[in-house]
Amino acid sequence: MTVENFNKTKIKICGLRRREDILAVNEAKPDYCGFIIEFPKSIRSVTADEIRELVNDLSPDIQPVGVFVNAPMELVKALMDEGTLAMAQLHGQENESYITELKAHTDKPVIKAFSIKTADDMENALQSPADYILLDQGSGGTGKTFDWSLIPKFQDVEIRTVRQ
């Protein structure tokens, strides 16, 4: 695994559902655009067919990220294989074997989100086979943060950042 240093913060705008949202994102020029895929509990969820259409309008300079919550592996693989997605972000209870199987199937990055409440949660996140880890307070999209004081305990650990 390679440590990558960046001089700028990476931006991902997430939860887009409409063509007009995509056109606005193209103007804003974030690094990544996240789509919540086939998760009916979210009002921001899109179907596989909808994301295929939306990505057609996305600027090629913006990488599409599929955000999945306990999705069937076949859905994630299909969207990555066909080139709809540049990477997958897993936000459910996907275990190590799920992540390992997905990584064996694709060379595209896999991000795993972890809810951080304790130092043990941090330790578990750092053991993940995912290409990158995302540290979160729990359910995404709330704007709430976790206790960032847990991070300094791991300063000697190789930090992985999302590739461009």
Predicted regions and their residues:
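Conserved N-terminal beta1-alpha1 strand-loop-helix module at the mouth
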Residues: 1-164
